[in-house]
Amino acid sequence: MRLAGIDRALAALAGLAGLLGVALSAAAAHIPGADSQKTAAQFLLFHAPAILALVGFGASGLARAGLARVAAGLLIAGLILFCGDLSVRAWLQHALFPMAAPTGGFALMAGWLVGILCALVPARRAA
């Protein structure tokens, strides 16, 4: 199985999410009252393997590649907005932009919904 360029990029972003999740967890362990950082770290760590799984399912033909890529992209966009807003609020005491966290949350939910479609919509058979 060979990964397409977009799949490699999505997998790399999943790895970055995992790395940032570990870094935020470590930072939050040393900052009293860093609940928002703990939440951001958990979201990053929980979603990184899901993104990798979606990339793998799509690339292997177990799911429709297009649906898997959309789901992974929505999860990544959601993480950027949700975790980014929580982190900016914690470190700089202002919002990323108005409604960034809720928008990110909706993108995460949409990503999971498309992930459900990946499971329910049969993959195309090879010709």
Task: State where each predicted segment sits.
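N-terminal signal-anchor transmembrane alpha helix
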Residues: 6-30
